Amino acid sequence: MKTDTPSLETPQAARLRRRQLIRQLLERDKTPLAILFMAAVVGTLVGLAAVAFDKGVAWLQNQRMGALVHTADNYPLLLTVAFLCSAVLAMFGYFLVRKYAPEAGGSGIPEIEGALEDQRPVRWWRVLPVKFFGGLGTLGGGMVLGREGPTVQIGGNIGRMVLDIFRLKGDEARHTLLATGAAAGLAAAFNAPLAGILFIIEEMRPQFRYTLISIKAVFIGVIMSTIMYRIFNHEVALIDVGKLSDAPLNTLWLYLILGIIFGIFGPIFNKWVLGMQDLLHRVHGGNITKWILMGGAIGGLCGLLGFVAPATSGGGFNLIPIATAGNFSMGMLVFIFVARVITTLLCFSSGAPGGIFAPMLALGTVLGTAFGMVAVELFPQYHLEAGTFAIAGMGALLAASIRAPLTGIILVLEMTDNYQLILPMIITGLGATLLAQFTGGKPLYSAILARTLAKQEAEQLARSKAASASENT
């Protein structure tokens, strides 16, 4: 009997181990309902905030244009009013950011990435009003900025706000709701739910903790924010470019060349953004008055351009359908591209509350259209359509700059409803991303976050030195 005991205990121990393993697997798959419910709340609030922000920007732009109509008979007065209206709105946005919440300046996406890494604080009680109303000022003034930056940062901060209000505990809940809000913000900004999900998974892949809980929460938040957007807006593509023709297989090599062009330009564009940040910082030197006046001058310039050359100002959504339809000459496309590169650098690098997604989409469209027009002339036997290159190029600069090709491809497809162009878009985006990686340089948001963290560390070191010096005295 004694010799049989070990043989009987071994199967029992094995069964216990199997039961324990199965129990662990089942428990790991149990998603706390509280987090999923909070994700739905976050998505709903983010969607409503994004709709309010979008409507507010549109209202301000209409009011600004209405003021110009009353001075149409007096050209010098018209230019003066165009400059002053945009300058005042821009200065309002710069003032709010500099005075009350410096972390609300710029895109805001690097701030969310830093918060997901526990390296940046989330002060939602001050960021939410400053980013919302400051963004209304800068975007309503016609500056070359996108609304996705504000909605992503607003979304992330709403996620943290809900966490604090309902007093949810745990690092996983904090991280999940922060990511959910950011994804919901991008989805609501562009009416692109799948792009919002991919944005978190791809662009924020170093920071996003991919778990069953987090991905379910992100899905729920994105669904709710998109529903809120579509309740108040039409359920159609955000940018109406019509149905374009497909790209024949024997023309796909042209899209690879287009991707190579963007792969060269993307890292250069990133260096220009960072260089312009340094230049403008030397101009204002951290002085709040100089910074606000500089912002007013940039905003006023965009206001003038909005009247003289409308295609060179604003986020660029109105420009994209016109360029895709081939309504610009080659010379005009070159002028628009150069002008918008300059205005994008000035507006975004100055620290104005606003994103860079939309301006980069517009730049990619213009450059893609120009390339398409050249290809049409050089290869008439292919019966090409320049608009297909415009759509392919639309997300290519985004892919080369922030190194998120999937997000760029899906975002453009959802915004334009031209899914038949997915293959040329993949080729263009992949070519742009690979070459951008080979040429070196960090993705834009990563580079901006690294600068922010370096500045934060320097400020903390300076405060500690000052504190130690005061103790010694």
UniProtKB/Swiss-Prot annotation:
> What domain of life does the UniProt record list for this protein's source?
Bacteria
Motif mapping: Selectivity filter part_2: 146-150
Short sequence motif named Selectivity filter part_1, residue ranges: 106-110
Topology feature Cytoplasmic, residues:
1-32, 117-123, 167-176, 202-214, 282-287, 439-473
Which keywords describe this protein according to UniProt? Antiport, Cell inner membrane, Cell membrane, Chloride, Ion transport, Membrane, Transmembrane, Transmembrane helix, Transport
Residues binding chloride, per UniProt: 107, 356-357, 445
The way it spans or sits in the membrane comes to: Multi-pass membrane protein
Site entry (Mediates proton transfer from the outer aqueous phase to the interior of the protein), positions: 148
Protein name listed in UniProt: H(+)/Cl(-) exchange transporter ClcA
* Chain ranges on the Periplasmic side, renumbered to this chain: 70-76, 233-252, 310-329, 377-386
Q: Species name for this entry?
A: Escherichia coli O9:H4 (strain HS)
InterPro entries for this protein: Cl-channel_ClcA (IPR023861), Cl-channel_core (IPR014743), ClC (IPR001807)
